[in-house]
Amino acid sequence: MSSQPNHQTSISSLLHDRLHIPPAETIVEKESAEKDTCQSQRKRKEPVLHEVDGSSSGAAKKQDHNAKERLRRMRLHASYLTLGTLLPDHSSSSSKKKWSAPSIIDNVITYIPKLQNEVGELTLRKQKLVELERRGPSIRAISVLELGESGYEAVVQICLKKENEDEFSNLLHVMEVQGLSVLSASTSQVCREQRVVCYNFHVKMDEKPCEGDDYITVLKNNIISSLRDNTKCK
């Protein structure tokens, strides 16, 4: 009976030798070693994957930054072009160099002070007109119409509120002060309730106006000034 286990052991050893089957302990140790190797390889690969992800994220951020910067420059360029359209001589030249961003800024810096001066002059002019209106509210309207091309004759129409009976005589005096000869005159009542009367004068100028001068406007302003002075004296 004791020889039977020995016999089985020898048979098992013979089978292992012939079939190259390793012992069970060896198989367990080998599987454990392979598992450890796979885990270590997986750990070594993970940092590489993180590096790839970081590089891809950095490239995406750079592309996004470049796109935003490109859009910002396009909007800025469009703003410069819009600013250039406000300049008076924008349509007179199609040169791209002239209307580049630096040139537009230079032109704007030069143009704005001119506008400020014009605004100042117009403001003073408005103040003078308001003052004249305050001092002589009875004058409603005045117009001067040139007759023919000679420049010697004109029709002056003055509409004002009749304050006294000698208003017509005062207007004749104003015409004479301006160097005008009255050829004919007429009056017409426009508004009876407000006592507004229109005086029409066909006048002739003693001297021919200088060519190129807006003498009609000058004459109109001079007549208005004379009327204001007469009103102030009263």
Swiss-Prot record:
GO terms for molecular function: DNA binding; DNA-binding transcription factor activity; protein dimerization activity. The gene is BHLH160. GO terms for biological process: cellular response to copper ion; regulation of DNA-templated transcription; regulation of transcription by RNA polymerase II. Residues 1-67 are annotated as: Disordered. Residues 1-13 have a biased composition (Polar residues). Its main location: nucleus. This is Transcription factor bHLH160. It is found in: Nucleus. Keywords: DNA-binding, Nucleus, Transcription, Transcription regulation. It comes from Arabidopsis thaliana.
